[in-house]
Structures are given as structure tokens and as C-alpha cells.
Amino acid sequence: MASSKLAVIVLAAGMGTRMKSSLPKVMHPLAGRPMVSHLLDTVSGLSPDRMVVVVGPDMELVGKTVAPFPTVIQADRLGTGHAVLQAKAALGQFDGDVLVLYGDTPLITRATLERMLAERRGPRDPAVVVLGFKPQDPGHYGRLVVGAEGLKAIVEYRDATPDQRENPLCNSGVMAIDGNRLWSLIERVDNKNSKGEYYLTDIVALARADGATCTHVEGDEAELLGVNARSELAVAEALVQARLREAAMDNGATLIDPATVWFSWDTKIGRDVTIWPHVVFGPGVTVGDNVEIKGFCHFEGCMVEAGVAAGPFTRLRPGAEIGEGAHIGNFVEVKKATVEAGAKINHLAYVGDARVGAGANVGAGTITCNYDGFNKSFTDIGAGAFIGSNTSLVAPVKVGDGAVVGAGSVITKEVTPGALAVARGSQMELKGWAERFRAQQAAKKAKKD
């Protein structure tokens, strides 16, 4: 009976030269996090007993990202078979199943991996299970040659006959391998090919020569996309977003124009939420039930509680906490601030490093002046307070509960609860001044003429 133990080897040492980037290929983000993290999250759902990530030299950033999973270094990039061999010391003589995956193939699903493991642990006891797929454009993919006895061979496109090239079943590179046979197979792979590399695909022929069976499982092209260029990264992003949008709608959210709403991998959206077109969610956003988010909003690192109305053109930055039933309107930016239940900041305001108390109203053009060039300071607006339009609150400062601040004020001192504070120059009126001024200017102009 096949073992239920599982080890995973993730190959992530590729240079990614086609990306034309100083960032390692597997670190390029999809939905707000590195593509390799998507893969590790999927694999973690299988509860593997061991996992090791194969990286290249000078890839410390990848090592930090995949931690606590261990990494091994492939000092010389001599092919996929050579990369797998680098994991031998970390895995040792593992007697379970070994999945070999690729850090630049981040969209593979847990369901597909479970099907591969079920095949590996099935009655045929195959030494190797290869994940195949049928792309719309088979191009120069290697082909899987399948017969009644299972997978007969993996043929590289350049070595394939015309008939084999007509075969639509292609090789994804993903494999499930019997751990008891893995190292015996890998150590016999040679580099007698045009590239002088050690190909993992050669283990199929070696296993069959040993009298073992090899089989395949077929996956979907969309989940087997390999990201090697920026154009493929864009395709992968679109596929990830399609999944996230579908999940949000399945969980009870309404997306007026789904294609224009962009989620992050960890966005949490409640039920009966309505999201209008052109909304972007950065990482770390939680939205409660019955929230309406109008168009052209950008949220990141924030909490939005039930019944909030936001937008259009609202920006919520990290640390923003918007309380139940609050209104955050057009061209309002909130950063590292708590807006309590029922408060309203309806237009043209900046609220940073602050608290806006329950039921308070912040008028158009109000800003919290939270930075003096060296330090950030806090603004505390009490419950039920009313801040008139075009007010500057110079932190640190406190406006008490129920207080009213007159429009155009520059508040630098504490306003006591229930008080009226007006801090602006007194209005002055000079009767007849405008008429005299116009006459003077007309006379000057006539004299010049």
C-alpha cells in the first residue's frame, strides 16, 4: 500500500532573464504577494511532512519570503533534474510521495495536486505521475506519449516525430514521484543532450526501463501557466483576479462591473456588499456586511465595518478603521485613523493619525496637520463634534465631544466639549472701496492710452 506521507520540492532557482528585472522571477507579485507565496499557500493545504525550496545563488530575498520552509542552493543551473538532486540532503531517504513543483507556476490548484497524489497512491503504484495539459497552442511544449500501459515517454518537441507533434497532450513539468525510487532515478539522469543539462523528464524512461509503471493526470491550461515574461505575468494576474472576483460574488457581494474591480490575495468582503466599477483593494483589507463602495476607490491595510458608505474617489490607507454606518465620501483620504460609528467625512478631506468620534461631522476641506517635518502627532475629534469647512487641525490637538469649529479655522489649542471655536482673522468691510478702486484703475489706464 502506498504511503500517505508527502514531501514537496519547489524549484525556484530560475534567473528569469526574460522578466528583465533585478527581482527574482518568483518574487514578482500576483494580487499583492509574490507568486511563489501563492504556490506555497496551495501546497500547505496538503499538510506536507517536508518541504524544501530550491533557489539560486544571491536569492536571499526568496529565502526570507518562503521561510519557515528551508531552502537549498543550486549553485550551477544545470537543469531540472540537477535542481531536484540538490534537495536530497534536505529530504534524505524519504519513503513517502514527493511532489515536484515550480515556483513560476503559481496558479496550480490543490484539487489538481490531490488528483495526482490519488493516482500515485492508487492500485497501479506508478513510480512517476506526470501532470499533462492540452493548451490551445501546443507550440514547442514537450509531448506526453500515452499507451494502454500508461505513460510511455516524454518527448521534447525538437525530438518529436511529425505524428507526435500532432499529439495535443503536453508536459507541464509537474510530477508526483515515489520517494523510495526518486534518488535512484535522479542519480542516473545524464546530460547527454544539446544543452548539456540534466532533465527531470528523463526519469520516466528510466523508471520504465526498471519495469515500473508511469502514468499521467490531466490539468487545465489556465492553472499551469508558467510565468517567464511580463506579458505572462499580466495573464496570470488576470486569471488570479478572475478567481478572486468569482469568490467574492459567490460569498454574497455584488460587483457592478467585475472586470474593473481588483482584489488582493487576502481581501475579505462581507455579504451584501456592493462594489461599483474601478475599485482597487491593496493587501490587508477587510470589509463588513452591507457596505457600498462607489467607483474609483483605493483601499489598503484597512478595516471597514458594516453599513459604511464610501466613495466615489475615497482612499483608505494602512491603519484606517471605519466604524459601522460611517460615511467616507469623495476625495477623502484616511490614514492610521479611527472613524467611529456614524461619523461623516463626506468630501475633500485628509484625516491622518486621528480619531473621529461617533456621529461627528467633518466638513469639506478639513485636514489634520499631523506632521511637523520630524514627528507625527495625534488629532482627537470627539463624538458629535462638528468641524466646519476648510478647517486645519494642527496636531497634537483635541476637539471635545459636541464642540463646533467654525469654517476656515486653524485650531492649535484644545476645544472644550460643547464649545464653539473660531480661529480666523476678523472680517473687515470698507464701504465704497470697490467703486473707488475701479475708478482709480480706469483713470490710470486712460492716462497711459
From Swiss-Prot:
Residues 252-449 are annotated as: N-acetyltransferase. The keyword Magnesium applies. The keyword Magnesium applies. Pathway: Nucleotide-sugar biosynthesis; UDP-N-acetyl-alpha-D-glucosamine biosynthesis; N-acetyl-alpha-D-glucosamine 1-phosphate from alpha-D-glucosamine 6-phosphate (route II): step 2/2; Nucleotide-sugar biosynthesis; UDP-N-acetyl-alpha-D-glucosamine biosynthesis; UDP-N-acetyl-alpha-D-glucosamine from N-acetyl-alpha-D-glucosamine 1-phosphate: step 1/1; Bacterial outer membrane biogenesis; LPS lipid A biosynthesis. GO terms for biological process: cell morphogenesis; cell wall organization; lipid A biosynthetic process; peptidoglycan biosynthetic process; regulation of cell shape; UDP-N-acetylglucosamine biosynthetic process. Residues 231-251 are annotated as: Linker. Residues 1-230 are annotated as: Pyrophosphorylase. PROSITE patterns: HEXAPEP_TRANSFERASES (PS00101). Acetyl-CoA binds at residues 364, 370-371, 389, 407, 424. Its cofactor is Mg(2+). It is found in: Cytoplasm. Homotrimer. This is Bifunctional protein GlmU. It comes from Paramagnetospirillum magneticum (strain ATCC 700264 / AMB-1) (Magnetospirillum magneticum). The gene is glmU.
